[in-house]
Amino acid sequence: MSNRGDRISSLPDELLCQILSNLPTKNAVTTSILSTRWRSIWLSTPVLDIDIDAFDDATTFVSFASRFLEFSKDSCLHKFKLSVERDDVDMCTIMPWIQDAVNRRIQHLEVDCRFSFHFEAVYLTLYLSETLVSLRLHFVTLHRYEFVSLPNLKVMHLEENIYYCLETLENFISSCPVLEDLTVVRIVDIITEKILRVRSRSLNSLKLVLDSSNGWFIDDIDEWKVIIDAPRLAYLSLKDDQSASFVISNLGSSAKADIKVSFNVNDIWDLPVTFERSNVGKLLTGLSSIRDLTISGTTLMIICHYLKHEPMPQFCNMVRLNARFYDCDLEMLPCVLESCPNLKSLVLGLLSSAETEQQSRVSSVPPCFLSSLEFVEIRSRLCRKRYVMKVARYFAKNSVMLKKFVYVGRVSIQEEDLLALLWRYSICEIEVRGLRR
């Protein structure tokens, strides 16, 4: 063991620093007791990763961080991760640390503040970093500056922040010419601007979250909007129960989307007379070019209401669909599938509604059943066996290209039940699995 320890200690300082860089700074410090050789190695690492919870009090925390930054002030800092969850730390002490990190050509900056108030990022240097590659800010107040330039930023996660005005966030996004990954998490009760615009020619992945689950749901339906124009987008995730309108432009044919929105509808079981159906049409049109779609039961229920009045656009590029359907909307299933003529894979989650199951007939056969649909998975947690078998029978009777049929659920359905339905497809593989809790 000692030989191995000696062998590690004989490595160059640069390599030892690289090894310690993979540890939280507080853990890296513990190596200083190994030997005289290790005593100051941790101070030379290009990473400062500190969490106030790892310290007994705020004074020790501030002293530790200040000592590290002072010792290595002439060297570049590769990564700075700061987690502060107590109000007894003076933000006037913390902000100079961030300014110092930016001045030392930092590449990765993460500030996670959970004060009872928002931490204010007031120094202009943060908005003009030429070296930042990734940036995560949580619970931070961002000021508006006329000029913002982040030429090398590729990953940006902005979570529960306050923006002095709408232009602050828009400028942040538009000032990142090589931005590839963007996450924006907003909370209704701290939002001052209700229209979010994301325009980027470089963006590859976009995740937008707007949460009103804390009870701050606001019924000013026409004001909350999301506008997206990102032609290189490969992945889009929308989790939004507040915005009423979603306008998506130039989405590519290879894109994947995960959609859970409610169009500012507070009760999906009782849509108001004033509900603007055209907002559903706008979202469907914006998504109609994509290849892979996951859609929630809430969103799909509102779409089913829309389809009773308006046609659904064609999703000609769609090959994979993961959708959750309420039993009361079963009659709309063929209508949805008819819009996906080239669908190959369908994962169908069956949900029980608060209403009595309707005795609707599902009889029409979508084109994909006859030409492309090869995989069907039905997932059910609480639905009755009769309902599940009704859906399974629909696919068994009409899907002539089917190669694999999977049932995942708690309803007691045996493989023999499905074999009885699919007996005429000798090449169709059947699988039955229990649903994990």
UniProtKB/Swiss-Prot annotation:
The keyword Repeat applies. LRR repeats lie at residues 86-113, 134-160, 161-186, 187-210, 215-240, 272-297, 322-350. It comes from the Eukaryota. InterPro entries: F-box-like_dom_sf, F-box_AtFBL13-like, F-box_dom, FBD, FBL13/AtMIF1-like, LRR_dom_sf, LRR_FXL15/At3g58940/PEG3-like. Residues 361-406 form the FBD domain. Pfam families: F-box, FBD, LRR_At5g56370. Residues 5-51 form the F-box domain. This is F-box/FBD/LRR-repeat protein At5g22700. It comes from Arabidopsis thaliana.
